[in-house]
Amino acid sequence: MLTSKKEMQSSENKQEENLALLLTNYISYQNIVIFTGGNQFKIRNKKEFTEYTIESNSLFFLAKNTHWDMEIVGIDNSNPYRKIIIDDALIKLLHSISSDDSCYVKKKIFTANLNEMQLNIVSNIITDIKYSGNNKKIFKILYLLSFFNDYNDIVNVILSASSKSIVDRVIKVIELDISKNWKLGDVSSSMFMSDSCLRKQLNKENLTFKKIMLDIKMKHASLFLRTTDKNIDEISCLVGFNSTSYFIKVFKEYYNTTPKKYNGVYSITQGTLP
């Protein structure tokens, strides 16, 4: 069957609209729960030869400091994904209500498929979380975790990674001024460590200082694009790039699209990756 040029172009445009994000070596620096919304997530761990396809309107949990290749395919752009962070307040509560005999869990990703009734409940919970105060928010997130069959394993994963890591401390310093082009020596000095000691500690986490810097700057760049009316030149400057053209190049390599197309093609208005 012959396909007209117009039909081929329409098909190509549809495919382009459906491709949301393509992230290589994505690192979740915090324990997170993601509601997929109108997106399909394809997640791979090349080191462990594992692959997961998580359909739209589902939940999944990613453990802190784990490495993934991730593709997000937008099926319904009017229904963006949502990211919920497991913060320190919730971790503190989990410590207070959990027994001391928590065990190590090797698995680092958990999924939950939702029926129609559960989907309605989860949607309401996520909306409530956004507008709730800290105490109410904590219990809403706990309720959200209860939709996972592996709830106990997830709690153990969260507790096992609850201590502040060297990566957390590095991120905290960098985010004091994301417009600054931090050097390893700047950060190690502020942490009262030698350069070599900090480098070794990051190597133990399979990370480099350069990788963390890139992830933090790209996270904030995507946030500025989606939550402000700042232009690309302004955003480039805010995240520490002296050249807008170089910022666009780096952004495109990271997110597989240009900053200009990022908002137009991807209706991801809640949460951000990384």
Curated annotation (Swiss-Prot):
The name this protein goes by in its record: Transcriptional activator PerA
Residue ranges: DNA binding: 185-206, 232-255
Pfam families assigned: HTH_18 (PF12833)
Domain HTH araC/xylS-type stretches: 168-265
Keywords from the UniProt entry: Activator, DNA-binding, Plasmid, Transcription, Transcription regulation
Protein function: Could help in the transcriptional activator of eaeA expression in enteropathogenic E.coli. However, it seems that it is PerC which acts as an activator.
Molecular function via GO: DNA-binding transcription factor activity; sequence-specific DNA binding
Protein encoded by which gene: perA
InterPro entries: Homeodomain-like_sf, HTH_AraC, HTH_AraC-typ_CS, Tscrpt_reg_AraC-type_HTH
